[in-house]
Amino acid sequence: MSKSTAEIRQAFLDFFHSKGHQVVASSSLVPHNDPTLLFTNAGMNQFKDVFLGLDKRNYSRATTSQRCVRAGGKHNDLENVGYTARHHTFFEMLGNFSFGDYFKHDAIQFAWELLTSEKWFALPKERLWVTVYESDDEAYEIWEKEVGIPRERIIRIGDNKGAPYASDNFWQMGDTGPCGPCTEIFYDHGDHIWGGPPGSPEEDGDRYIEIWNIVFMQFNRQADGTMEPLPKPSVDTGMGLERIAAVLQHVNSNYDIDLFRTLIQAVAKVTGATDLSNKSLRVIADHIRSCAFLIADGVMPSNENRGYVLRRIIRRAVRHGNMLGAKETFFYKLVGPLIDVMGSAGEDLKRQQAQVEQVLKTEEEQFARTLERGLALLDEELAKLSGDTLDGETAFRLYDTYGFPVDLTADVCRERNIKVDEAGFEAAMEEQRRRAREASGFGADYNAMIRVDSASEFKGYDHLELNGKVTALFVDGKAVDAINAGQEAVVVLDQTPFYAESGGQVGDKGELKGANFSFVVEDTQKYGQAIGHIGKLAAGSLKVGDAVQADVDEARRARIRLNHSATHLMHAALRQVLGTHVSQKGSLVNDKVLRFDFSHNEAMKPEEIRAVEDLVNAQIRRNLPIETNIMDLEAAKAKGAMALFGEKYDERVRVLSMGDFSTELCGGTHASRTGDIGLFRIISESGTAAGVRRIEAVTGEGAITTVHADSDRLSEVAHLLKGDSNNLADKVRSVLERTRQLEKELQQLKEQAAAQESANLSSKAIDVNGVKLLVSELSGVEPKMLRTMVDDLKNQLGSTIIVLATVAEGKVSLIAGVSKDVTDRVKAGELIGMVAQQVGGKGGGRPDMAQAGGTDAAALPAALASVKGWVSAKLQ
């Protein structure tokens, strides 16, 4: 009996655990502190800093089953998903890693044992082929002489991508840095399937499938292209869980493994589909995995960056559900079946099931309102298409008006062998893309420019001033030996009281000083295990090795501590008031305000905001002790400590407790007791994305300042209304009621004036071929009164055509009315369009009534004068 996908995942982890590897949990799909990556797309992402020497772990061997998404940027598999056997937006990457521990011999032997041993995967050895980099004789000999693979099944792959070391079998992290050859293991499905061995002209067939890639990081590539051997070579491997499951379950397509069969059946059930071979079922089964796990990891549907990729995937799934005949929202109903089939890998998702389902349901409901109309428009455009390419302007209109991502439009077109003019679409999108780039958080990361080999010891929990030694200096990202007055730089110390930005808390400010120099610190950031003080040398000179006195801005730190502690209290209060679905999605803690983003699907009611505020202030009055304990990560979680979104934790963690009210993992700085906070006030609550709310609040002196400001505003209003705070509400109600009465009277007067104006105008109508034509520019008439006037004039004139215009603040307002007995010859929409075009505008409407606007008031007289000739031609 073949293993289930869940059993295969566990067997992989168990095997490497038996070989001395630390089993490390999958990291978030949102890469931690790596703005160059849209999503986590490989097992090694969470170990990138370890491979670069910027981070150290208390283990040298690791194994993971890493959740990955490839649906944007360089790795964009979206358009192929559902149409091929192995493309997915979401997949799990099984991996084993050596950080300067074992190398080629053990890596290859481990892989061979797991794949072929009867105790483990028991694959037939004769079905396995391997590739090695052309010049990697060491790996070749291990495969041939130690493992015993015949030479004809070991293939050397050279530089096949047009440049030195540009090869399928040579891996590199970037233009410079760690790199090395790799060996890949392929499984031969048999000659009943078309395809040739790797490196052959038929290698793209489905017979020989890559199941494992083992990378040997043994070089450090320099800027000039030279390769220097690494002092401690490392290993990074990746094996797609879905691919190895297909092999072990004796199927050729990933969509035929047990996991996908179960999901496809669930999709069929919620959509009412009966043909289980329908590709739309495969699309939806894939997409629920990426969408659910992305939301669980904090990504919310939006129109930019990660959120837009998520929205594209959701809408593609909804459209395929529509093709299957789904009559109601269905996508969110697949979260439960997904949790069931993912086994232990779905535990994080299960904890957030309600939130994930609500976000998916809301997004589907929003898109469903425009899906039918958008598809109808697309069908209409495709029906009248003469060539084989849909113009970019139509694709943009579908995106802009109906929310169709361009790849969804391309999906529909591809089914009819029609291409989309993507260049035209991009041209139409240029302005939006420019704005998105400006708002984007993706770009050059100053932190990534600096590599610090040394480590800094943080002593800021107990000290605000400390003597330290300069271990490194950086100017414009480059290491220097000394800096002079006026230069901006990053200063690294061996020990420091300065807190580096982390966990939402901003970095400290202050001063580094000595007898002959002063360095003003404007920010503090982490660089691997080092802490960098960013600022400017105000006086003197500073060099590596100098002793400094590090002084943190004490007053600023104190305000930050209060805000950070209040954030923890508010988080716990939100969970009590709104429910345990509340989890942190982001935060900012500085010396002026605290900002907290959290999962919740609707705006908070005023009474809920008040309840949270009251609950936090109650804990402040209790004056609870704020205590920290260092413990193992798993023990902390077992204790109920909440982990914060987007943070990376070591095996030993700092647990912060506030009496019996709040327990969280936190490395930030805090007050000693909750009473130190003094007062807590919420100043705003708003939405930032679907399913995410944001609260801004102040504490201590900042909160008192807002109380005074509110009191001052009330006093000013009371003075203006000639009242006092005791009867202020009654005074406001009285003023509002009087205002409403006056507005009503004013409207009645306007309507009377318009009726009188209509009566005066009717006498100015002229006869054109038996139809009364009235064209007039009015002054002092509000644009919104034009429709009422046209209705009155129609009643007075009988068979008639009316065009009225008015100008207000330089803008032209136009309206055309045509009596129904004339609309077979003259249509109001065409008439108003002709006039509007002449005044720099556009408009439209029904055959009997149409409105438009324009910007060229000077052209209005000529435009109105043209109406008689145009109408005469139509009535002949």
Curated annotation (Swiss-Prot):
One of its GO terms (cellular component) is cytosol. The keyword ATP-binding applies. One of its GO terms (molecular function) is aminoacyl-tRNA deacylase activity. The modification N6-acetyllysine is found at residue 74. SUPFAM superfamilies: Class II aaRS and biotin synthetases, Putative anticodon-binding domain of alanyl-tRNA synthetase (AlaRS), ThrRS/AlaRS common domain, Translation proteins. Its EC number is 6.1.1.7. Keywords: Acetylation, Aminoacyl-tRNA synthetase, ATP-binding, Cytoplasm, Ligase, Metal-binding, Nucleotide-binding, Protein biosynthesis, RNA-binding, tRNA-binding, Zinc. CDD domains: AlaRS_core. Belongs to the class-II aminoacyl-tRNA synthetase family. This is Alanine--tRNA ligase. It comes from Escherichia coli O157:H7. The lineage of its organism: Bacteria, Pseudomonadati, Pseudomonadota, Gammaproteobacteria, Enterobacterales.
